[in-house]
Design a protein with these regions (language model features):
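NAD(P)-dependent short-chain dehydrogenase/reductase
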Residues: 137-191, 195
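Mid/C-terminal beta-alpha module of Rossmann-like enzyme folds, strongest
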Residues: 192, 199-249
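NAD(P)H-binding glycine-rich loop region in Rossmannoid oxidoreductase-like domains
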Residues: 40-79
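Substrate-binding strand-loop-helix patch
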Residues: 154-155, 179-188, 208-225, 281
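Conserved C-terminal active-site "lid" loop/helix of NAD(P)H-dependent oxidoreductases
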Residues: 214-220, 241-282, 287
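N-terminal Rossmann NAD(P)H-binding glycine-rich loop of SDR-like oxidoreductase domains
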Residues: 1-22
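Adenosine-cofactor binding site in Rossmann-like domains, unifying the SAM/SAH pocket
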Residues: 21, 26-45
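Catalytic helix-loop patch of NAD(P)-dependent Rossmann-fold dehydrogenases
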Residues: 69, 76, 80-84, 104-146, ...
């Protein structure tokens, strides 16, 4: 099978390329520099040239602050482009997978969010991602949307991805508090996405690892694991701060946004590993 991966230069995209090749798939991958999905008119020509059987869109404008500053670009990348690709894939008989986010919710629920829960976004990013999901499924009812959350992995720009290096260098680590959610090692996320695609399911599914956590709990678990392997850990204290004290975090995030994975596990016929196991896998990958 040939798979075309959009946003292949991003964290999840890179792992999707590796996992697809590991499964023996033929891969056509495009980074943001190689294929700008905001140019929606190139979808048809790209499909005709590459002739894939599956397209996975991992391209997204994920900076909440940038989305607020440039709403037109956010709408183009997170909403209009996925719709265009979903429509063209439907026309060409190509399966289409689009990646979503927990940030479409406001965090006011007291239990994990279900795939069918209605979006209640707090930010421009969340609004456009929610509208993007809606448009994708309207343009192509056979499309698959897989929601991810707090993704971490090698070479990632996210705080969780950078955390092991920070713990090895700083005595006091300050991070955003007051938030609980699901997290996902990018390697496991890529396995879930491809497993769901191979099952030929459609609609909305959640692709996170089992359990919920906070950034502080994640950091403390990383310290525990690193020390158990005899790795150098300089950090002596993990300190939670309110979001308004964290430089660069100007846009509200949901305070509670775990994603329920029961339906995903039913379809896959397996239990998805807890996030702690994903952290172990990640630390081993980077040699910590």
């Amino acid at each position: 099978m040939k798979v075309l991966i959009l946003g292949a230069g991003g964290l999840t995209g890179r792992y999707l390329v590796c996992e697809s090749k590991r499964r023996g798939m033929e891969v056509a991958s495009f980074t943001k520099q190689e294929l700008d999905i905001s140019k929606t008119d190139i979808a048809r020509d790209t499909l005709a040239k590459e002739r894939p059987e599956l397209v996975i869109n991992s391209a997204s404008l994920t900076s909440l602050e940038l989305c607020e500053e440039n709403p037109a670009l956010s709408r183009k990348v997170n909403c209009e482009a996925p719709e265009a690709w979903a429509k063209e894939c439907g026309r060409a008989g190509v399966r289409f997978v689009h990646l979503g986010t927990d940030y479409i919710f406001d965090g006011k629920k007291t239990s994990a969010y279900l795939p069918q829960d209605l979006p209640t976004p707090l930010s421009r990013y969340g609004k456009d991602k929610a509208e993007g999901e809606k448009r994708v499924l309207r343009a192509n009812p056979h499309a698959l949307v897989v929601r991810l959350a707090w993704v971490f992995g090698h070479g990632g720009k996210t705080f969780m991805s950078k955390l092991p290096g920070i713990l090895a260098e700083k005595r006091v680590v300050e991070l955003a508090g007051g938030r609980t959610g699901s997290c996902t090692y990018a390697g496991e996320a890529s396995r879930i996405i491809l497993d769901l695609a191979e099952k030929r399911v459609e609609g909305i599914f959640h692709g996170v690892q089992a359990g919920e956590t906070t950034w502080k709990r994640f950091a403390e678990k990383a310290i525990e694991l690193m020390k158990s392997e005899g790795r150098s850990v300089v950090c002596e204290e993990v300190r939670e701060l309110s979001q308004d004290k964290i430089p660069g975090l100007r846009v509200p995030r949901p305070a509670f946004s775990p994603l329920d994975i029961l339906e995903t596990e039913k379809i896959l016929g397996r239990k998805i590993p807890e996030w702690e196991k994903g952290l172990v896998e990640y630390l081993r990958e980077i040699g910590w």
